[in-house]
Amino acid sequence: MSEPSSKELFEFKRTLQELSDKRGRGTELVSVYIPPDRQISDVAKHMREELSQSANIKSKQTKKNVQSAIEVIMQRLKLFPKPPEKGLVMFVGMVPRGGPGTEKMETYVFEPPEPIKTYIYHCNSEFYLEPLREMLEEKETYGLAVLDRKEATIATLKGKRIDILKTLTSGVPGKHKAGGQSQRRFDRLIDLAAHEFLKRIGEHMNEAFLQIDDLKGIILGGPGHTKEEFLNGDYLHHELKKKVITTVDTSYTGEFGIREVIDKSMDVLSEIDVMREKKLVQRFLRELINEDGLASYGEREVRQHLQMGAVEVLLLSEDLKYQRGTYECASCGHRMEKTGRDLPDTETCPSCNDQMRLSDRRDMIDDLVEMAEEVGTEVEIISTETEEGMQLLRAFGGIGAILRYRP
């Protein structure tokens, strides 16, 4: 089950914002969360029961609207022999567009970015969105290890969930009090035992972490200098070494040590995605200032480079609030594309001066993402939470490209 891309998360956030703005006149907006292992027939049976129960609603209008929403859900359920891989969410209800009598039935049915865990039926004046909001919390997987010469604990952190994978003990003896040659020989044995223990830790970490495709980083912790000795030695696979974010001094090993590592690393963990975005925009800026740099910006130039397949990474600001429209002239057949914040329904035809009508209107981010996907270009939606993200929006119109080659 793959992790959602930045583009998919952006679209999910946009849908969530749209849903959060909806309000019903009464408690008549219906939300249904269906886990992937739930039988559709069970859900349909429950909907029939709710339809029967809704006959007890006192308000005639609310009763009618709730029953209409449930009937729409029952019809939509017939399209699914079983829930999708991550489950199914359904939001249905009469949403007013203005004063009384302007209500329209609105229906949203989609697979969420993460699996649904619990079946929910909810009817209120707002759609129930809390489970979806929780999906926007950070869910990347991080590798954690706390170690000293006596003990090591290996774990993963995903969102708020900690999984202890392995606890190891060394059997390395403590300091020997004898002096002279006996002391030196004993110290060598201690160092050899410690070396073998660090090798064992590395083997278990390699086995645990190399198989995690979406591993975002590794944090090492523990009392003393054993963690630095481990990191600087030849114990950890070279690909995992690259993912070590930081080392943290802790008072404990074991599970207490793991929790201490997390507590002391919250600032670092929260900055990981932000740093990735910052580095992408900084790379774009470096390319831009070079005479032969592989970068372009602005809608027209980036569109041209996308059409040529020359764009490696497309950078789009999440605050890019423009529409892309297609106008058609019924008289001469001329077609025209136009970008704007609020496109008019008609334009004057440049070919025959007759009136052109807006035949298609779409979000500009969706339009550019579609172009990028057709030519295999990676898309990154950049937030405005960093100085670099604001610079992309304000200085470059929110559209930048890192190129594969200079056309």
From Swiss-Prot:
GO molecular function list: translation release factor activity, codon specific
A single Gene Ontology CC term: cytoplasm
SUPFAM superfamilies according to UniProt: L30e-like, N-terminal domain of eukaryotic peptide chain release factor subunit 1, ERF1, Translational machinery components
Pfam families reported in the protein's UniProt record: eRF1_1 (PF03463), eRF1_2 (PF03464), eRF1_3 (PF03465)
Record key words, sorted: Cytoplasm, Protein biosynthesis
Record's subcellular location: Cytoplasm
Cystine connections: none
Coiled coil regions in record: none
InterPro entries: eFR1_2_sf, eRF1_1_Pelota, eRF1_1_sf, eRF1_2, eRF1_3, Peptide_chain-rel_aRF1, Peptide_chain-rel_eRF1/aRF1, Ribosomal_eL30-like_sf
Protein family per UniProt: Belongs to the eukaryotic release factor 1 family.
Assembly with partners or alone: Heterodimer of two subunits, one of which binds GTP.
Biological role: Directs the termination of nascent peptide synthesis (translation) in response to the termination codons UAA, UAG and UGA.
Protein's recorded name: Peptide chain release factor subunit 1
